[in-house]
A protein has these predicted regions:
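Non-catalytic signal-transmission and effector/linker regions of two-component phosphorelay proteins
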Residues: 1-7
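Short acidic/polar segment at the start of the alpha1 helix of CheY-like receiver
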Residues: 12-16
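Charged docking surfaces used in two-component/phosphorelay signaling
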Residues: 17-25
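Conserved dinucleotide-binding and phosphotransfer motif residues
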Residues: 25-26, 73
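Acidic, metal-coordinating helix/loop segments flanking the phosphotransfer/catalytic sites
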Residues: 32-51, 69
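The short loop immediately C-terminal to the conserved phospho-acceptor aspartate in CheY-like receiver
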Residues: 56-57
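A short, hydrophobic beta-strand element within the central beta-sheet of small alpha/beta folds
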Residues: 75-78
Length: 78
């Protein structure tokens, strides 16, 4: 059975690692992005993402902007 993919987006490496480690222990496949722009790149490269865990305050593009952009294409839970 394929593991569900979760995209974790946070500009703080420690937070991404903490969330990633927890999710991997629960047998999820974790994709990471360090800012909003990178999050969109990862999202559009992997259309089978089951969930996005998204920080709101990030450089380049904040979480609200990312959420609006993704919502125009998908109803993936954020």
């Amino acid at each position: 059975m394929d593991r569900q993919k979760i995209l974790v987006v946070d500009d703080e490496n420690r937070m991404r690692k903490l969330v990633k480690d927890f999710l991997q222990r629960e047998n999820f496949e974790v994709l990471e992005a360090g800012d909003g722009s990178e999050a969109l790149d990862v999202f559009f490269a992997h259309q089978d993402i089951a969930l996005i865990i998204l920080d709101v305050m990030m450089p380049k593009m904040d979480g609200w902007q990312v959420c609006r952009e993704i919502r125009s294409y998908s109803k993936v839970p954020i």
